[in-house]
Design a protein with these regions (language model features):
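Short, solvent-exposed helix-loop connector elements
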Residues: 27-31, 188-196, 226-234
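A short, charged helix-loop
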Residues: 162-189
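Generic structural signal for alpha-helix starts
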Residues: 85, 226-228, 240
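Conserved small/polar residues in nucleotide/adenosyl-binding loops
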Residues: 235-241
Length: 242
């Protein structure tokens, strides 16, 4: 690969779920009674990317079966999520066969989620000067955006939204894409069943990050009157030390 290449990395399950629920009110049932909504939506999205963007390199990342290192670190990780709809479960093997027919690599690593794989590859490619697009509706990917790495988000109204550094900063009202990590660390992430600091929501998390710059900055100023609730609420934070 070289700096003239264009790499697309697709978050498979995020796009499959999105496709399935896009047709939830009018599912695409074939003559055999099989719900093809997820398959149709995913393939339409893939075709649109291939024709519109003409990437030189592309890969589709899947979550592996079984727990990941996050489940080992936090037993309740994603514990609140309902079981995968049967139509999606039955569609995934077919979607994988279709991806293989396109001769597109399937990226799947035991113990790691698709976003871990995408994040690693996107960061490495970006550091090599390769223009890289992470295709997902997941806001968490904002922390990975850099000079050469972009989010490629499907829009509810159709089409896609490309988000670079300035777009991510504007969306979250932050000064650095790295502050996405600090925001989520303080407020938690309900979609993944990850708790934040008790009593801290999105508005307070944003205010703290804007005032102190980072989660580490908050930790270093626990005696500041701007930090509420009481400092004891922050004692569960595990922060790296240099």
């Amino acid at each position: 690969m070289n700096s003239d290449d264009k790499l697309f990395l697709l978050d498979a399950y995020a796009l499959i779920y999105r496709a399935y629920y896009a047709f939830i009110k009018s599912p695409r049932i074939n003559s055999k009674g099989f719900n093809t909504s997820a398959i149709l939506g995913f393939v339409n999205t893939l075709e649109e990317v291939l024709k519109k963007e003409n990437p030189t390199h592309i890969g589709v990342a899947f979550d592996p079966a079984g727990p990941t290192f996050r489940h080992e670190a936090y037993e309740q990780y994603k514990a609140q999520r309902e079981e995968t709809p049967e139509a999606i479960r039955l569609s995934v093997p077919i979607i994988k066969d279709i991806i293989r027919a396109y001769r597109i690599p399937i990226l799947e690593v035991a113990g790691y989620e698709a976003d871990d794989v995408i994040g690693t590859l996107a960061t490495e490619a970006g550091q090599q000067g390769i223009t890289t697009y992470m295709m997902t509706p997941d806001k968490d990917y904002g922390q990975l955006v850099s000079e050469n790495v972009f989010m490629y988000r499907p829009k509810h109204t159709g089409g896609f939204e490309v988000m670079g550094i300035e777009q991510v900063k504007a969306k979250f009202d932050i000064q650095s894409t790295q502050q996405v990590i600090d925001m989520l660390g303080l407020m938690g992430d309900a979609s993944d069943n990850i708790p934040g600091v008790p009593g801290i929501g999105e508005k307070t998390a944003l205010a703290l990050v804007q005032k102190f710059g980072s989660l580490q900055g908050v930790y270093e100023h626990l005696d500041d009157k701007a930090i509420k609730p009481k400092p004891v609420s922050y004692t569960h934070l595990t922060l790296p030390t240099n």
